[in-house]
A protein has these predicted regions:
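Noncatalytic alpha-helical scaffold of FAD-dependent oxidoreductases
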Residues: 1-419
Length: 419
């Protein structure tokens, strides 16, 4: 089925898609035919990006392809259609008694979209969601299908593909035996304590998030600990006090949408995200941006942002600071560097946010900040090229796999590939 009416906006209502057609294939052969006969095309995922990365003249939704989720216990993998969302994948994984190594803050996003943009959760030893990929199947611009597995040449360049290499139709991910997680929240962490004990705090659980508005006493620390590992003991956390009720990262909001806290153990999938699958995580009245910085620059980078606090706070809903382990994926924000992610959830005030993002990027320039591909940023293509040592290799890979430029939308030309 093909839709030709207005395609609407992203999840937050901050970007209106410009595509003229939306194709909804129900089988792979239709995907091949659409791609081979279209001049300019891209895949539309769960609409959780905050920029035009997933826009083009024509779009393809893979939601109507059979999910075909298959767990291979011997290989410790799960394979699935690229149209599957994490929330739906989780149901099968839990039924089969297996788990992923990590999840993003909300499970409502598509697996393929998260992988293509190197979306991440948190954890000193946990790579982003793309690091779980063991195999990809993809439709090239010629309409042909090819598959590539971990260890083969150029695999590391194809996983975080930004939609530039082809239409990923099937994904195989690493899994492990299911595990339980308990979550505790601490309030009132002071900046000096965070600065003095940053590594201790960010490694005191399997997954740790620090929520802040860049003031002195409004900081929350969310610690998600595997029950089969030893993490932070009872008591305070370098002066921060354990919460006695469930909290929302935005303290004024009800915690009903959030995953259970107070140390109550539960399945990995019910604790690693901040928001429950059966909830609406936000009103959508927001804009997001995020920058990933090598751990060695983290404290200086946070101080540079704090220096802008008076200008940031009027338009900020909340910031989140997380850790992500290094990987070998060419266009991952964590390529060859253990990273600290500084995330901003802004009020939906586009003009003010755009100006603030420029100021933040200027402040973070000395620290070689890499912007999150799916969020709002202004970093130009020349700067991007300098930030990624395999950038030239990626550009060559795009030219080889998509010689006619079918997947090179305006966003890719502007920020990644150049004109």
């Amino acid at each position: 089925m093909t839709e030709t009416h207005a395609l609407g906006s992203n999840w937050a209502g901050t970007y209106m898609y410009q595509a003229q057609k939306l194709h909804r294939p129900t089988k792979i052969e239709q995907v091949q035919e659409i791609v081979a006969n279209t001049t300019s095309v891209h895949v539309l995922g769960s609409r959780h990006s905050f920029n035009s990365i997933a826009d083009s003249v024509e779009l393809i939704s893979l939601e109507d392809l059979p999910a075909a989720v298959v767990v291979d216990h011997e290989a410790q993998t799960v394979s699935l259609s690229a149209g599957v969302k994490y929330g739906d994948l989780i149901k099968t994984l839990n039924h089969e008694g297996v788990a992923l190594h990590n999840l993003a803050s909300l499970p409502h996003i598509s697996v393929a979209g998260a992988i293509a943009t190197a979306t991440h959760g948190s954890g000193v030893t946990s790579g982003n969601l793309a690091t779980a990929v063991a195999k990809l199947e993809m439709v090239q611009s010629s309409g042909e299908i090819f598959a590539i597995s971990r260890g083969e040449p150029d695999f590391d360049g194809m996983v975080v593909g930004l939609g530039a290499l082809g239409v990923v139709t099937r994904i195989t991910l690493d899994v492990q035996p299911a595990y339980q997680v308990e979550q505790r929240v601490f309030r009132g962490l002071r900046w000096k304590a965070l600065s003095d004990h940053f590594d201790e705090i960010t490694s005191c659980g399997y997954s740790v998030s620090i929520f802040t508005r860049w003031g002195e006493m409004d900081n929350q620390v969310w610690i998600k600990s595997r029950t089969d590992e030893t993490d932070w003991a009872e008591g305070d956390l370098f002066g921060a006090v354990a919460a006695t009720v469930d909290l929302n990262p935005i303290i004024e909001r009800d915690a009903i949408a959030c995953t259970p806290q107070l140390g109550r153990p539960g399945l990995w999938s019910d604790r690693l995200p901040h928001f429950r699958m059966d909830s609406i995580p936000s009103s959508g009245q927001e804009i997001q941006s995020e920058y990933l910085i090598a751990r060695r620059y983290a404290l200086e980078a946070m101080e540079a942002v704090r220096a802008l606090a008076d200008e940031i706070q009027p338009i900020l809903q909340m910031s989140e600071i997380r850790r992500v382990a290094a990987d070998r994926l060419w266009m991952s924000m964590n390529y060859e560097q253990d990273s600290v992610a500084i995330h901003f959830t802004w009020k939906r005030e586009p003009e003010a946010v755009q100006k603030m993002v420029v100021q933040i990027e200027n402040a973070l320039t000395p620290f070689k900040a890499r912007p999150h591909w799916g969020k709002v940023f202004h970093t130009d293509v020349a700067t991007i090229a300098a930030l990624y040592t395999r950038h030239a290799d990626f550009v060559r890979l795009v030219g080889r796999l998509d010689p006619r430029g079918a997947f090179r939308n305006l966003w890719l030309r502007t920020y990644v590939l150049g004109s």
